[in-house]
Design a protein with these regions (language model features):
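Paired acidic/hydrophobic, glycine-rich loop segments that form the ligand-binding mouth/hinge
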Residues: 12, 33, 51-56, 71-73, ...
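Residue-level signal for nonpolar/aromatic packing positions in well-ordered secondary structure
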Residues: 4, 23, 45-46, 50, ...
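Alpha-helical elements of the RecA-like P-loop NTPase motor core of helicases
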Residues: 2, 20-21, 42-43, 61-62, ...
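Periplasmic-binding protein-like
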Residues: 57, 61-103, 121-131
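Beta->alpha turn/N-cap motifs
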Residues: 15-17, 37-38, 54-61, 98, ...
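Ligand-binding clefts/hinges and TM-proximal coupling segments of bilobed small-molecule sensing domains
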Residues: 18-27, 31-35, 72, 103-131
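Short helices/loops that flank or line small-molecule/ion binding pockets
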Residues: 3-6, 25-26, 38-58, 66-67
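Short loop->beta-strand "edge-of-pocket" segments that line small-molecule binding or catalytic clefts
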Residues: 2-18, 31-32
Length: 131
C-alpha cells in the first residue's frame, strides 16, 4: 500500500515474524520498528509515535476490539500458505497417503469444522491442490 510505504511512516511488526521478514524485503520508504512479539505490536504502536501496526489479522482484530479508535485497513499485504511434509526418504505411497489425507480433510469440511470449533476467524481453507 503506497499510503503505508511512505517516508516518515513507522510500521511496527513482531520481531522475527513471517511478516517482519516479508516487509523487510518489500518496504522501500517506511521504517520498520520491531516489537518484542506479535502480541506486543499494538501496545508498542500505541506507546510510541508510530503510524502503522502490522500483523496477523486475528490479533489485530482482537486488539482493535480492546482499544477504541483503531481501524484496520482493508485487504492484506501477504498470505502465509500452510503445508505438511514428509522426510525425503519416505516412499511415494506415504506421500500419496498424506496428500490424500490433506485433500480429504479439506474437501470433507473437517478443516473448516476445526477452524469453527476453535473460533479461528479471518482464515480460509485452501483450495484443492494443483496437479
Amino acid at each position: 500500500n503506497a499510503q503505508v510505504d511512505a517516508p516518515g511512516n513507522d510500521i511496527v511488526v513482531g520481531k522475527g515474524s513471517a511478516y517482519d521478514l516479508y516487509l523487510s524485503r518489500h518496504i522501500q520508504h517506511a521504517s520498520l520498528v520491531r516489537a518484542a512479539s506479535s502480541q506486543a505490536v499494538v501496545d508498542t504502536f500505541l506507546s510510541g509515535n508510530h503510524q502503522v501496526a502490522a500483523g496477523v489479522r486475528q490479533q489485530l482484530e482482537a486488539d482493535a476490539a480492546r482499544v477504541p479508535g483503531l481501524r484496520l485497513l482493508p485487504g492484506r499485504f501477504m498470505v502465509i500458505e500452510q503445508a505438511m511434509g514428509l522426510p525425503r526418504n519416505r516412499s511415494a505411497r506415504a506421500e500419496a497417503l498424506l496428500r490424500s489425507f490433506v485433500e480429504h480433510a479439506k474437501a470433507s469440511g473437517e478443516v473448516a469444522a476445526a477452524l469453527q470449533r476453535n473460533h479461528v476467524q479471518g482464515v480460509s481453507v485452501a483450495p484443492p491442490a494443483r496437479g
